[in-house]
């Protein structure tokens, strides 16, 4: 996890440095100064990086607590049924095969079949399944779903997604404030401090840029689902993974709070055109086709 954080922080700093140098070489910084914008790009870059990463990393750090509160998930401390015993044994076996520590295992009350994994540390994660999943799927299918979630943990997907979100947040904040400065100083000729135009323009620009930037995060989310499916197939068996996805494809795919939808196994209803860009999961039929294509 530490290596992953260092890599992404270094990448982000490198990109910020390149962006800063590029703006100077292209004369954008001097142009802004000539227009009287009095904008310190280096300070703005640092500010944007701090704010951009703080939110995503804090969210990651408290992700297990948040997930439990949002779903009402109850961690299995002492199994009270054969189903709970089987869940713990299956997760433990998958975790050992994947080379990670034993995660917490929880069940949350929901009629919708779903499951999710979260946590900042791959050796101290949380895997939760809905009561609907246990009621509507057989053991082989549930085993595959658990393998899918364990693969998310083993791949470090939660950490990577949070860091990508941090990079995206940084650029959204940075560019939105540059646009706000330009409009406020150049168009409305504000000489001291910030006028209403800065705040209004920055808010609008940040909203638009955040929507566009979310496409990057959602694209990554869709790619990691294919990887988790492949990992689930390795842990539980390809046919079990395909059967689980086929069963999910025939069921309703709701039930998780919005903050956790990207971490659930269900999702990815059939969508056409531009709507596909805003999906956190690929369509079920594409995920099944990808598994069938693997040898």
Swiss-Prot record:
Biological process per Gene Ontology, one example term: proteolysis
EC nos: 3.4.24.-
Keywords: Cell inner membrane, Cell membrane, Hydrolase, Membrane, Metal-binding, Metalloprotease, Protease, Transmembrane, Transmembrane helix, Zinc
Compartment(s): Cell inner membrane
Record's bilayer topology term: Multi-pass membrane protein
Molecular function terms from GO: metalloendopeptidase activity; zinc ion binding
Cofactors, names only: Zn(2+)
Any single Pfam family the record assigns to this protein: Peptidase_M48
Residues holding Zn(2+): 148, 152, 225
Active-site residues, record numbering mapped to chain: 149
Classification via InterPro entries: HtpX_protease (IPR050083), Pept_M48_protease_HtpX (IPR022919), Peptidase_M48 (IPR001915)
CDD domains, per the entry: M48B_HtpX_like
Entry's transmembrane regions: 5-25, 43-63, 159-179, 198-218
Main location, first listed in the record: membrane
Cofactor note: Binds 1 zinc ion per subunit.
Assigned protein family: Belongs to the peptidase M48B family.
UniProt protein name: Protease HtpX
């Amino acid at each position: 996890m530490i290596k992953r954080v260092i890599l992404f922080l270094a990448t982000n700093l490198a990109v910020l440095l390149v962006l800063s140098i590029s703006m100077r070489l292209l004369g954008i910084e001097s142009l802004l100064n000539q227009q009287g914008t009095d904008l310190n790009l280096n300070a703005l870059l640092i500010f944007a990086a701090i704010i951009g990463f703080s939110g995503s990393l804090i969210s990651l750090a408290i992700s297990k607590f948040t997930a439990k509160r949002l779903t009402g998930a109850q961690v299995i401390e002492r199994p009270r049924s054969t189903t709970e015993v089987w869940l713990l044994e299956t997760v433990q076996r998958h975790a050992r095969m994947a080379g990670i520590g034993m995660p917490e295992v929880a069940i949350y009350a929901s009629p919708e079949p779903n499951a999710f994994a979260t946590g900042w540390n791959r050796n101290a994660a949380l895997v939760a399944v809905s009561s609907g999943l246990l009621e509507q799927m057989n053991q082989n299918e549930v085993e595959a779903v658990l393998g899918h979630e364990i693969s998310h943990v083993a791949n470090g997907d939660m950490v990577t997604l949070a860091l990508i979100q941090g990079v995206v947040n940084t650029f959204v904040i940075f560019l939105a404030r540059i646009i706000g400065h330009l409009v406020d100083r150049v168009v409305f000729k504000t000489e001291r401090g910030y006028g209403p135009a800065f705040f209004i323009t920055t808010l609008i620009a940040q909203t638009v840029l955040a929507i566009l930037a979310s496409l990057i995060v959602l694209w990554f989310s869709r790619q990691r689902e294919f990887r988790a499916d492949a990992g689930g197939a390795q842990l539980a068996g390809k046919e079990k993974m395909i059967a689980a996805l086929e069963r999910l494809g025939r069921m309703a795919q709701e039930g998780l709070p919005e903050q956790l939808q990207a971490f659930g196994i269900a999702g990815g209803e059939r969508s056409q055109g531009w709507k596909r860009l805003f999906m956190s999961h690929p369509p079920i039929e594409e995920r099944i086709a990808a598994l069938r294509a693997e040898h």
